[in-house]
């Protein structure tokens, strides 16, 4: 396992595109949080006693902000991990020099998991720093901290793994991202809301893949919006944490099987 990680590290440390995607995520996390703080403090009057940056509620807010950053850059990073093998014609070389197809895929997954773990720790640090910057009293409830760190890790890993699988299938970074963006941003939401919801009703339209991953760290104030809606008009805006976790794990399992089958059947 260590050998596989070392092989991946040797590939990526000199790849400018990979470095840019990862560092962009690292840099944009605190920038996004600071911009959010600046915006919210400017639009909420000082005489309204609302503290959006107190603990533990701040975790939901910061998680939602970094969700959007990860949606772009972690997906791109996952795609780059595999498409550079095609563009550099190194995939076949890896297999010829001794790696099995399963080991090749495992090396990608392991490296992605380590990168996501680093980003998760950085997310935790950035959230604490934002709380200090906002003047909030630091209250670290272990269960809340672990919950949001796990949700963040699963979210970024899911985004990255989706990117990896799409890159494995379509082989070109630009094409892979365009297809992902069109599906996740337009096709899935339109079909879920306009077709699925009108036919089946209820909340089942929320269980599509991209939305399941997104709802791991959703917009944090849906509950307040629901309180302003009459009981007979209530709708579910997002999946619960548990349902989002279960749906995400199921989709990751299906994607993992798809990636494994692709690796076994392709003639690289």
Regions flagged by a language model, labelled:
Residues 21-26, 176-187, 203-207:
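Central hydrophobic cores of alpha-helical transmembrane segments
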Residues 77-97, 101-102, 109:
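Transmembrane helix boundary and interhelical loop/hinge segments in multi-pass membrane proteins
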Residues 1-26:
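Aromatic- and glycine-rich beta-strand/loop motifs that create alpha-glucan
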Residues 198-230:
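Short hydrophobic, aromatic-rich alpha-helical segments embedded in or entering the lipid bilayer
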Residues 16-19, 102, 174-175:
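Residues that define the loop-to-transmembrane-helix transition and helix capping
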Residues 18, 22-81, 106-171, 185, ...:
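Secretory targeting signals
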Residues 246-268:
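Junction motif at the cytosolic side of a transmembrane helix
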């Amino acid at each position: 396992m260590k050998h596989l990680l070392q092989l991946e590290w040797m590939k990526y440390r000199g790849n400018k595109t990979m470095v840019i995607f990862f560092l962009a995520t690292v840099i944009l996390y605190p920038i996004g949080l600071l911009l959010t703080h600046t915006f919210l403090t400017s639009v909420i009057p000082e005489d309204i006693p609302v503290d959006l940056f107190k603990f533990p509620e701040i975790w939901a807010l910061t998680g939602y902000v970094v969700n959007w950053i990860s949606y772009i850059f972690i997906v791109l990073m996952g795609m780059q991990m595999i498409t550079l093998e095609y563009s550099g014609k190194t995939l076949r070389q890896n297999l010829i020099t001794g790696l099995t197809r399963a080991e090749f895929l495992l090396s990608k997954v392991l490296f992605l998991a380590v990168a996501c773990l680093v980003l998760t720790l950085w997310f935790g640090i950035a959230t604490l720093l934002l709380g200090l910057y906002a003047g909030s009293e630091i209250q670290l409830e272990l269960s809340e901290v672990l919950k949001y760190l796990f949700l963040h890790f699963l979210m970024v890993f899911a985004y990255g793994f989706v990117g990896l699988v799409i890159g494995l299938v379509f082989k070109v970074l630009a094409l892979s991202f365009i297809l992902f963006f069109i599906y996740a941003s337009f096709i899935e939401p339109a079909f879920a809301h306009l077709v699925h919801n009108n036919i089946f009703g209820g909340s089942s339209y929320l269980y599509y893949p991209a939305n399941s991953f997104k709802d791991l760290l959703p917009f944090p104030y849906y509950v307040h919006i629901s309180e302003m809606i009459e009981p007979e008009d209530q709708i579910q805006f997002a999946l619960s944490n548990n349902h989002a976790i279960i749906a995400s794990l199921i989709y990751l399992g299906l994607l993992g099987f798809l990636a494994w089958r692709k690796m076994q059947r392709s003639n690289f």
